[in-house]
Amino acid sequence: AWEFFHPDEPVPALLQYVEDRDIWKWEFAQSAPFLSALDMEPKTFERWKEMTRFTPEQLDAFMARGAAMDEKFRKMAHDIAEGAQPLVFNGVAGLMVNAPGMFHSLVGDILSAKTGTFALMWSATDKGVKAGLRAQRNFDCIALAESMGGGGHAQACGFRMPVARLPELLTGV
């Protein structure tokens, strides 16, 4: 879209990095630190416009802040992933772990790389259970989500269910 509306301007780093995470390509080494800092910023057009015009010095400082946050986030994600348990979901073996929603993508990537199939991350509140499914590019987990009334994309999808069904999920069968 940027190229269409701004054909004579380079795509801002902010947009490149957001796309890099959104489609889980991770082509740019700077994406993770930049996005870790971005996640702490106000989600306003004014602030995002400022960030598209960062000087190289401002961008370096922003990235340094984000690099420290990304390192801590990755450490916490690996710690969460260590608590994973096996499960069989609709006849498919995978791994599951209790994880806050903000960790679903990274923990899911770590665990689905181990299984070769999928990872299921879940969290429960009084409103119900939120389950996120993640898979590597060689496995499509959308059918699993759809079987529970959910949806999403082939490698990132999810569903919700009542808390009363949590024991059924935790049996892993």
Over which residues does each language-model region extend?
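Short alpha-helices
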Residues: 1-44
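Gly/His-enriched, cation/cofactor- and phosphate-binding structural elements
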Residues: 75-173
